[in-house]
Amino acid sequence: MKMLVDFLPIALFFAVYHLSDDILLATLVLIPATLAQVAFVWWRYRRVEKMQLITLALVVVMGGATVIFHDAAFIQWKPTVVNWLFAFAFLVAPLFGGKTLIERMMGKAIALPAATWRRLNLAWVAFFIALGAINVYVFKTYDEATWVNFKLFGMLGLTLLFVLGQGVYLARHMPRDTLSQNDHQKDDV
């Protein structure tokens, strides 16, 4: 259910845009939808992830600028800004506490050598930088409707492919005892 709630604002943005061909109207729907999403997550789980707060702030600021100035470039830059902020966070996180951000998120579930965590983390940095750059390329090169489609399907598809690749990488680099321990835990359930 959480994934559905996370996906709802962009799905509404996409639907409103394709029903109206009006990016300003779609942005006007996106802002309260994102606010409602974060409010629901807080109400339901009593915590909101930093990523959701950053996204909310950028939707309000850049979406607001899109509406106020009647300029779609602001909302089109938002995915790039979000991705580049994430890349920066993944890059500098080891300077604060020694662990990579990916290890902080997944380290309790998976035991990996420090070098593997660093490579995974750098892969995420590269992915976020590339995704931000691809977004700029798409909105600068193609029409608005193509960008809206890319925002939903292209970015989601690229992210799913990257996560699948990460899964393959993790499976190849997990210590054998971790794999067998996880298999035994599954058998116990």
Swiss-Prot record:
This is Inner membrane-spanning protein YciB. It is found in: Cell inner membrane. It holds the Pfam family IspA. It comes from the Bacteria. The chain crosses the membrane at residues 23-43, 54-74, 82-102, 120-140, 150-170. The keyword Plastid does not apply. Belongs to the YciB family. Plays a role in cell envelope biogenesis, maintenance of cell envelope integrity and membrane homeostasis. GO terms for cellular component: plasma membrane. It is a multi-pass membrane protein. Coiled coil: none annotated. The keyword Transferase does not apply. InterPro entries: YciB (IPR006008). Keywords: Cell inner membrane, Cell membrane, Membrane, Transmembrane, Transmembrane helix.
